[in-house]
């Protein structure tokens, strides 16, 4: 049996990935595997710019709406799910198209996973209790002592990642920075061609981000977050689902911690920061094909042709 193949289409948020993926689907018999950690959640449609029902009816999409916002999803599970799906799609005589911008997942897929321990509910509860008693700053200072390298790259208010770094240290006796620095041996079980949309005009990308955020508001984003609060009372601002860009800012607005103009400003700024981080990852990622979606009028045609050549179609 021939080795399965997958074509990855990467890029920053609001960079045109979805539109291009649908163009490819008009030409080739593809199925889309979402590379987006926010799209896995049900009930989070507007703020994640989730593909519409008509778009999902036009071409099969995978790894969308697979868990509730109170459940968790991981890079390890993505690697497992994506690898399985590439094989299944290939067995149907169709082509796997991996589309998105969650670069941590893509790195895990292509470079392997570090040997980090699973989350420990008892230890996490103990850390949460310490945070309630002494404050997040206490946990951050503790992390600075046991793992200064990780503490240096985390923001002092990043509760989830500070807690996870301390959890790893207490479970293994080694700082997370040591684990992440350990080499991993990894071989993909399928052939992969990696293409990326990298816009050089940052102002144009920022404009797209602002326009899309305002469109989300018009579509009822605040109502969507209010519905999440009603359906899932256990959700908090620190829940992984609510840490998705835009949702954290909307949550704070609904908590009365900010006014509406400040919420909008913070939401747009956070989305721009996400795009900046994605572009930083992309520039460090080995790529087979790169195009600028804003300045290259033939980017769509060139990527479709690259996909055809790769799949032998």
Swiss-Prot record:
Q: Where does ATP bind?
A: 11-18
Q: Does the keyword Magnesium apply?
A: yes
InterPro entries per UniProt: Dimethylallyltransferase, IPT, P-loop_NTPase
Enumerate the catalysed reactions: adenosine(37) in tRNA + dimethylallyl diphosphate = N(6)-dimethylallyladenosine(37) in tRNA + diphosphate
What's the Enzyme Commission number for this chain? Answer: 2.5.1.75
| One annotated GO biological process | tRNA modification
Source taxon at top rank: Bacteria
Q: What class of enzyme is it?
A: transferase
List positions binding substrate. 13-18
Annotated site residues (Interaction with substrate tRNA) in this chain: 102, 124
Q: Which UniProt keywords are given for this protein, alphabetically ordered?
A: ATP-binding, Magnesium, Nucleotide-binding, Transferase, tRNA processing
Subunit-level organization: Monomer.
Instruction: Cite the PANTHER family for this sequence.
Output: TRNA DIMETHYLALLYLTRANSFERASE
Q: Which family does it belong to?
A: Belongs to the IPP transferase family.
This protein is called what? tRNA dimethylallyltransferase
Identify the coding gene.
Answer: miaA
């Amino acid at each position: 049996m021939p080795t399965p193949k997958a074509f990855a289409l990467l890029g920053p948020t609001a960079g045109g990935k979805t539109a291009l993926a649908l163009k490819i689907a008009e030409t080739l018999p593809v199925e889309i595997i979402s590379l987006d950690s926010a799209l896995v959640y049900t009930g989070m449609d507007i703020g994640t710019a989730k593909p519409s029902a008509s778009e999902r009816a036009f071409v099969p999409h995978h790894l969308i709406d697979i868990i509730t916002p109170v459940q968790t999803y991981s890079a390890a599970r993505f690697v497992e799910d994506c690898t399985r799906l590439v094989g299944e799609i290939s067995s149907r005589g169709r082509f796997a198209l991996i589309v998105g911008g969650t670069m941590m997942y893509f790195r895990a897929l292509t470079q392997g996973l570090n040997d980090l321990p699973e989350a420990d509910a008892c230890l996490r509860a103990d850390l949460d209790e310490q945070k309630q008693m002494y404050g997040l700053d206490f946990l951050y200072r503790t992390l600075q002592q046991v793992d200064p390298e990780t503490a240096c790259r985390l923001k002092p208010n990043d509760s989830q990642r500070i807690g996870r770094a301390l959890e790893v240290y207490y479970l293994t006796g080694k700082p997370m920075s040591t684990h992440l620095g350990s080499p991993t041996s990894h071989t993909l079980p399928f052939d992969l061609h990696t293409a990326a949309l990298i816009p050089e005009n940052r102002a144009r990308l920022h404009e797209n981000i602002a326009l899309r955020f305002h469109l989300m508001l018009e579509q009822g984003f605040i109502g969507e977050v209010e519905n999440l609060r009603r359906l899932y009372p256990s959700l908090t601002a620190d829940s992984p689902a609510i840490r998705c860009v835009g949702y954290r800012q909307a949550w704070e607005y609904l908590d009365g911690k900010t006014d509406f103009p400040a919420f909008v400003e913070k939401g747009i700024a956070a989305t721009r920061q996400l795009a900046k981080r994605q572009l930083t990852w992309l520039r460090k990622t080995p790529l087979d094909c790169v195009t600028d979606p804003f300045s290259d009028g033939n980017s769509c045609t060139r990527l479709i042709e690259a996909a055809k050549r790769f799949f032998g179609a």
